[in-house]
Amino acid sequence: MPRFFLPRLSPPDMHISPSIFKAYDVRGIVPSTLNADVARALGRAFGMAARQAQQTTVAVGRDGRLSGPALSQALIAGLMDVGVSVIDIGQCTTPMLYFAASTLCASGIQVTGSHNPKDYNGFKMVLAGRAIYGAEIQALYQRIQAQDWQLQSGATLHEEDVLPAYRERILGDVKLKRPMKIVVDSGNGIAGATAPGIFRALGCEVI
């Protein structure tokens, strides 16, 4: 079972703005259009889509935004509500989540506001090996509106640090012809926690 406080179950009359369901992701302003209730409902909807695609496990990661932990916890709770097991990879870049969703399982969700201002957050989703978009994202909204899910027990949760394997994959793919001196500026992004170590492992001098 999850090792954290679970938000309350989404009330039947909960209003979710359709405006947060974009072409390629779900994205809103915290807490006015995006909160823990919305995240848990999305977890249930995505979990049902995963089950229909014969996916029993979903990887979940998040960027460094302050709203990330609460939204991630609620999302995980929603996935587990409908019987989908979760691999929580914690703070990571979106490429690291995609890596986890291709090596540890085949589906994943990254809690991220991408390039948007700090009060935004959102979800990028991979289902059965491919990013979902367009009609598939709108179908999640319709499922939430209809409360179209079946609660199911038996899901498991465990944490996984994917950085070592991710770094080794990069080191296996990239070979520098000469040493380089580079400056890394992640613009307050979560890559600031991972990129310098990866570049140093490649043989770069990082300033």
Positions of the model-derived regions?
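Aromatic (phenylalanine/tyrosine) cluster motif
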Residues: 4-5
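An N-terminal, well-structured beta->alpha segment
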Residues: 11-75, 81-82, 159-180
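Ferredoxin-reductase
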Residues: 54-128
